């Protein structure tokens, strides 16, 4: 509850208030009667109900929440409450929020940045560093559920992977450690299926614990036996990247594409894996069960290709906006699903500074023909002296 104070505004300064001439002729009994009526009124509440605070805060744009949480304990309690997320959802006020993990090797480890997308006062779109979050371990896997990001494994030194897992609350930019995994992992696959986090690889394969599952409700890790012959071809057991389509985990290995169905514990590769890998590169994301990936070589005439798992075919994304891209290094770009729009992050190098660009694209799908990409915005959002490495970008909703 937030405490408010009452103040006196009777116009007196310690003495008897001056009366107007007409007040001198009033009947004192009338004044007594009015005082009795006032005394019978319910007292003014000295506390604002949490429900009222919550509904008021729900109307405020989420970009102000981290600053608002610093004002008082009452605001921190409301902003970090699950009820606020439920209130915003019921009012259809939830917003996608985009985070990027960017480092400047060898000068700094990757740090989290937030994209200020709907900021007020005509401040341009920009990436802002989040000082309250610690640097991330290289090679961590990151998944999102609602307004939370789960950071899994990574390296804390040369050849020293860790079992640690922590969760970031994006509403107030705080993090808390969770129970550790059974295995230490580096560049593992981590994806969410039916509200559970599946972690695959990132370590040498052992049949009994190469796959682990985290139940976010109970906070318990469990292992999934896997006696298949599928494994990573990379040293240390890591993978290039992964996505989820049709409740299956699609994995890009250095030599092939793999598909894991966690419901029945089966794997697919073969012809599917060959077709899947033909235009799949690390910069990728899934929007409405379609896989979007950069093709640095533009082999199909477009820098972005789209994979449909229903027909197992890659098609180039078209649109005049794609030809307007700045001179990005496509190998180092990153993609994200931003509320159904395609977000692209990439850098251009203009000595002595480097600009990191954000390109927001609306997707137009017809009954037939290729998907069209229309640019909504294309602006530099971060300028730096050192060359950035964009490790990943993720969107959350709150």
Swiss-Prot record:
InterPro entries in the cross-refs: F-box/kelch-repeat_ARATH, Kelch-typ_b-propeller, Kelch_1
SMART domains listed in its UniProt record: Kelch (SM00612)
Keywords tagged on the record: Kelch repeat, Repeat
Transmembrane segments: none
Keyword Aminoacyl-tRNA synthetase: no
Domain F-box: 43-90
Pfam name, any one: Kelch_FKB95
This protein's record includes keyword Manganese: no
Kelch repeats by residue range: 148-195, 196-241, 243-289, 295-342
Location of the region described as Disordered in the Swiss-Prot/TrEMBL record: 1-46
Listed Basic and acidic residues bias regions: 19-32
Name of the protein in question: Putative F-box/kelch-repeat protein At2g29780
Species, as recorded: Arabidopsis thaliana
């Amino acid at each position: 509850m937030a405490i408010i104070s009452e103040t006196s505004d009777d116009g007196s300064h310690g003495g008897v208030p001056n009366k107007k001439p007409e007040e001198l002729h009033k009947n004192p009994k009338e004044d007594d009667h009015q005082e009795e009526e006032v005394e019978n009124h319910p007292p003014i509440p000295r506390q604002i109900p949490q429900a009222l605070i919550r509904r008021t805060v729900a109307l405020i744009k989420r970009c102000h929440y981290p600053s608002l949480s610093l004002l008082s304990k009452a605001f921190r309690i409301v902003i970090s409450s699950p009820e606020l997320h439920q209130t915003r959802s019921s009012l259809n006020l939830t917003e996608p929020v985009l985070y990027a993990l960017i480092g400047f090797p060898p000068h700094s480890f990757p740090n989290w940045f937030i994209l200020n997308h709907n900021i007020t006062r005509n401040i341009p779109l920009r990436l802002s560093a989040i000082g309250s979050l610690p640097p991330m371990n290289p090679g961590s896997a990151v998944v999102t559920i609602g307004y939370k990001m789960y950071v899994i494994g990574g390296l804390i030194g040369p050849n020293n992977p860790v079992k640690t897992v922590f969760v970031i609350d994006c509403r107030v930019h705080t993090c808390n450690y969770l129970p550790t995994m059974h295995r230490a992992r580096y560049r593992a696959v981590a994806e969410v299926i039916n509200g559970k986090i599946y972690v695959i690889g990132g370590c040498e394969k052992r049949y009994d614990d190469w796959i682990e599952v985290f139940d976010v409700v109970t906070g318990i890790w469990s292992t999934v036996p896997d006696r298949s012959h599928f494994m990573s071809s990379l040293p240390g057991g890591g993978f290039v990247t992964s996505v989820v389509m049709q409740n299956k985990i699609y994995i890009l290995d250095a030599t092939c594409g793999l598909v894991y169905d966690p419901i029945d514990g089966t794997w697919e590769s073969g012809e599917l894996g060959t077709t899947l890998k033909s235009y799949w590169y690390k910069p990728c994301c899934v929007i409405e069960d379609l896989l979007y990936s950069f093709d640095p070589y533009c082999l199909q005439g477009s820098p972005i290709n789209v994979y449909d798992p229903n027909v197992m075919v890659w098609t180039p994304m078209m649109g005049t906006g794609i030809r307007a891209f700045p001179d990005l290094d496509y190998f180092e770009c990153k993609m994200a699903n931003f509320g159904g729009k395609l977000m692209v992050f990439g850098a251009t190098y203009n000595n002595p500074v480097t600009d990191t660009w954000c390109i927001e694209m609306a997707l137009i799908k017809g009954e037939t023909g290729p998907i069209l990409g229309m640019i909504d915005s294309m602006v530099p959002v971060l300028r730096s002296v050192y060359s950035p490495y964009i490790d990943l970008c993720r969107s959350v909703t709150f």
